[in-house]
C-alpha cells in the first residue's frame, strides 16, 4: 500500500519508533 520512501521520510521526521506507532495504524500497515 505504501512505498518504502514514505516510511523513510516519516522515520527521519519523527523517528523509527514514533513513526512505526503513528504511521502504521494510520495507513493500516506495519513498518
Curated annotation (Swiss-Prot):
Q: Where is the composition biased (Basic and acidic residues)?
A: 7-18
Q: Which family does it belong to?
A: Belongs to the aspartate/glutamate racemases family.
Q: Which reaction does it catalyse?
A: L-aspartate = D-aspartate
From the UniProt entry, list the residue stretches annotated as the region Disordered: 1-31
Q: Which residues form the signal peptide?
A: none
How is this chain's activity regulated? Inhibited by hydroxylamine, aminooxyacetate, phenylhydrazine and sodium borohydride.
Q: What is the lineage of its organism?
A: Eukaryota, Metazoa, Spiralia, Lophotrochozoa, Mollusca
Required cofactor names: pyridoxal 5'-phosphate
Temperature dependence (free text) = Optimum temperature is 25 degrees Celsius.
Instruction: Explain the activity's dependence on pH.
Output: Optimum pH is 8 for both directions of the reaction.
UniProt name for this protein: Aspartate racemase
Its function?
A: Highly specific toward aspartate and entirely inactive on glutamate, alanine and serine.
Name one molecular function that GO assigns to this entry.
aspartate racemase activity
Question: What keywords are assigned to this protein?
Answer: Isomerase, Pyridoxal phosphate
Q: What is its EC number?
A: 5.1.1.13
Amino acid at each position: 500500500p505504501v512505498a518504502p520512501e514514505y516510511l523513510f521520510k516519516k522515520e527521519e521526521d519523527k523517528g523509527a519508533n514514533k513513526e512505526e506507532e503513528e504511521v502504521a495504524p494510520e495507513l493500516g500497515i506495519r513498518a
